[in-house]
Amino acid sequence: MSRCKFRSLNYSEFLNLVEKSDFEEVVTREHEKIMAQKVDGTFNESMKLENRKLNRYLDMLCFDHTRVTLPAEKNRGDYINANYVDGYEYKKKFICTQAPLQQTAYDFWRTVWMHHTRIIVMMCKKKENRKQCFAYWNDIEGGDIVFGKFKITTTQIETHLSYIETTLLVTDGTSAIQEVTHFVFTQWPDYGVPNDVMNLLNFILTVKSAQKDVIRQLAQERFKIGDNPPPIVVHCSAGVGRTGAYCLLDSAISEFDACATISIPSTLINIRNQRYYCIFILPQYFFCYRVMERYVNLTVNKVSKKLIANVATALFNKVLHLKDN
């Protein structure tokens, strides 16, 4: 099957699309084409007998070519069900992974530590439909939890309408210490979509703002490990649906801010080439369009108001100048 190609849309083309009467039909066909497109990749490490127990779901495997490889330790392999995923601004902006299991929590923190990660985004609740995300951090302020050499201390918790922001201090038994901000979005049900577009949009913009703060702080510290900022670790339950949607929307917002274009289908194809099976549920794909529709409208309105204000100021100054003369 030939590979699908989709062109970028400018803001007016995008808004015309989402306002069309056959929008759902058009996007359904688009999603079907993306799902049918063959993705090249192998899953040899995921399918090894010793690694199968480290996968939360037997059918949610991890590409070999983009997988995170952990440093080997005694009685510990290098495998974790996690993949690097590019963002719009730079490569390997994200590490997309499954919710930690009891037997993988230590590997999760090894991943965070080795990449100097400063932000974790959790797109699921601790408990959903009787499924439990293993408690890999302590949700009591002042509490701590230990996994192997890592001690994770909770120093601050802020509860908001649709998310929880927690500050964690991570140590590895040496004098080194790493501060991590842990964001949990609480309004996205498994296999469903949030009830409110703005809740998710505000959450994504909040995390993007936090990442900008991290980049500024690292610049002040003259951080020199790698060419790019530390990756953001993103997970839900399987690490493909809500996780994929988060990465798609983050990238789409960055693209629109930089170029005033929107490339939702091609962005999803790029993500799926790096993390297997992302956004395979159609309603989640629709919802990404609705979030971007809101963001584009808000941005265009803000720009329009600014232009109107600038024109009004220019006219006012011109009138004053004429009066003075």
UniProtKB/Swiss-Prot annotation:
Matches recorded under PROSITE patterns: TYR_PHOSPHATASE_1 (PS00383), TYR_PHOSPHATASE_2 (PS50056), TYR_PHOSPHATASE_PTP (PS50055)
Reactions catalysed, as given in the entry: O-phospho-L-tyrosyl-[protein] + H2O = L-tyrosyl-[protein] + phosphate
Annotated Gene Ontology cellular component terms: host cell cytoplasm
Intracellular or extracellular location(s): Host cytoplasm
EC number: 3.1.3.48
TM region(s), chain numbering: none
Active-site residues, record numbering mapped to chain: 236 (phosphocysteine intermediate)
GO molecular function ontology, one term from the record: protein tyrosine phosphatase activity
Pfam families membership: Y_phosphatase (PF00102)
Entry keyword set: Activation of host caspases by virus, Host cytoplasm, Host-virus interaction, Hydrolase, Inhibition of host innate immune response by virus, Modulation of host cell apoptosis by virus, Protein phosphatase, Viral immunoevasion
SUPFAM superfamilies assigned to the protein according to its UniProt record, in alphabetical order: (Phosphotyrosine protein) phosphatases II
Location of the Tyrosine-protein phosphatase domain: 27-295
Any single biological process term in GO: symbiont-mediated suppression of host innate immune response
Family assignment from sequence similarity: Belongs to the protein-tyrosine phosphatase family.
Purpose of the protein: Suppresses host immune cell adhesion and phagocytosis. Triggers host mitochondrial membrane depolarization and caspase-dependent apoptosis.
Entry protein name: Tyrosine phosphatase H2
Organism: Microplitis demolitor bracovirus (isolate Webb) (MdBV)
